[in-house]
Design a protein with these regions (language model features):
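C-terminal helical cap(s) of enzyme catalytic domains, especially alpha/beta-barrels
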Residues: 173-176, 241-248, 300-326
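Internal, glycine-rich beta/alpha segment that forms the wall or movable "lid"
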Residues: 77-85, 101, 110, 114, ...
Length: 326
């Protein structure tokens, strides 16, 4: 087994090993020393929409020293696809909750993460129960990733208006946190309200699983700083990652981040294949975790095409040898 070490941020002179504090908001700090976590994306679609393949890939990633496996989500895909949309309508995607539960039940240490759930399309009371159950099944290994969504056809099919989806998402996050953490859950919001109820089991992680907000829009960045333990950017090269990390730090200097959220963990799925030098460039920007595509060298239209599971396993081994090795 290869340990998840060996990729570290460069030293930062005096005070090395400590994060910088940005006006009450602790953000992954460029130049600080920390272990880079490595995750694997798409554990629920394409090749891994087959349950046996998903389990094989997750177990192999766990044995290779990967820190986490991540699902993607669309409840429905547009057909025909709009210009620039690379996921074919025929792409099989296992439901996020089903996939996380499957993988959690067949692994023991690797974290299971939703990257991301399109939160405005969900019922937050039901989703809170589902995610709490995943956290129990996984013995506290859940990372709950949420996004506002962007596919209009998906919202129309679900009967949810796209307008106001960001406000709806924030309302839902507050409601789910109440269900996870309050002794007597009560919440009064714009889109969801409840009182006189309880919901068990509570998540294994107390007071709640870590929440990650996905997206690159200014509203998503602000939401991550103000409401979440982490931020997730998808398909980003090094320059774009640097721009967004800088925007997060600027927001951190302007906000009053709730102290209980702790440091904001920065996660990125890189655009294209990686080598050690490129990983180091992301690390220098303060990125805490890289979540790799199963076919990182494929062109965008081909990234979702099913491939033999053995090819994904070989890609995992390559990362373990070239990036995770000490």
């Amino acid at each position: 087994m290869v340990s998840n070490r060996g990729v570290r941020r460069v030293k930062d002179g005096p005070g090395e090993g400590r994060r910088r504090l940005f006006s009450d908001c602790d953000i992954g700090s460029a130049g600080s020393v920390a272990v880079m976590k490595i995750g694997l994306f798409a554990i629920n679609y394409g090749t891994c929409a087959d349950p046996e393949a998903a389990v094989r890939v997750a177990r192999h990633a766990e044995a290779a020293g990967f820190e986490s496996v991540w699902t993607g989500e669309h409840v429905a895909l547009p057909d025909p696809a709009p210009r620039g949309f690379t996921m074919p309508a025929s792409l099989p995607l296992l439901d996020t909750i089903a996939a996380l539960t499957l993988v959690a039940a067949h692994t023991s240490t690797i974290k299971v993460a939703s990257g991301i759930i399109v939160l405005p399309l969900r019922n937050p009371v039901i989703l809170a129960k589902e995610l709490a159950s995943v956290d129990v099944v996984s013995n506290g290994r859940l990372i709950a990733g949420f996004g506002a969504g962007y596919v209009s056809a998906e919202f129309a099919a679900a009967g949810v208006p796209m307008a106001g989806r960001g406000v709806r998402m924030e309302d839902y996050i507050r409601a789910m946190r109440a269900l996870w953490s309050m002794d007597r859950p009560v919440y009064q919001g714009r889109f969801v309200s409840f009182t006189g109820i309880d919901a068990h089991p509570r998540p294994r992680q107390r007071p709640a699983p870590p929440i990650v907000i996905g997206g690159e829009a200014p509203a998503a960045l602000r939401r991550a700083v103000m409401m979440a333990e982490g931020w997730y950017g998808f398909n980003l090269d090094v320059p774009e990652t640097g721009r967004l990390a800088g925007a997060l730090r600027q927001l951190a200097g302007e906000c009053e981040r709730p102290a209980g959220l702790g440091p904001l963990e920065l996660t990125v799925t890189p655009a294209g294949p990686l080598d050690k030098a490129t990983v180091d460039r992301y690390a220098e920007l303060g990125i805490d975790r890289l979540v790799l595509l199963p076919q990182p060298d494929a062109s965008p239209p081909q990234r979702h095409a099913p491939v033999p599971v053995d090819r994904i396993l070989r890609n995992i081994d390559t990362v373990a040898d070239q990036i995770l090795g000490s």
